[in-house]
């Protein structure tokens, strides 16, 4: 596998489909990073990413970032990554 430098297991929590889908991963991962900046809580990002973005934290972050109109797209991306 050709995994970019700087990537580790913590970057892909349960996301078996991340290889070959880096653009999707970057897209959903950015939601969690932005969410942590909004809430200023060091645990938000890891909770958002947990179980490959399939927890309620991920959905809460989408809503907190005022991206409700794209929630189905982000959930689809997360499900692709989890495969």
Curated annotation (Swiss-Prot):
One of its GO terms (cellular component) is extracellular region. Pfam families: Crust_neurohorm. Disulfide bonds join 15-52, 32-48, 35-61. Gene3D superfamilies: Crustacean CHH/MIH/GIH neurohormone. Its main location: secreted. Inhibits secondary vitellogenesis in females. Has no hyperglycemic or molt-inhibiting activity. This is Vitellogenesis-inhibiting hormone. It comes from Armadillidium vulgare (Pillbug). The lineage of its organism: Eukaryota, Metazoa, Ecdysozoa, Arthropoda, Crustacea.
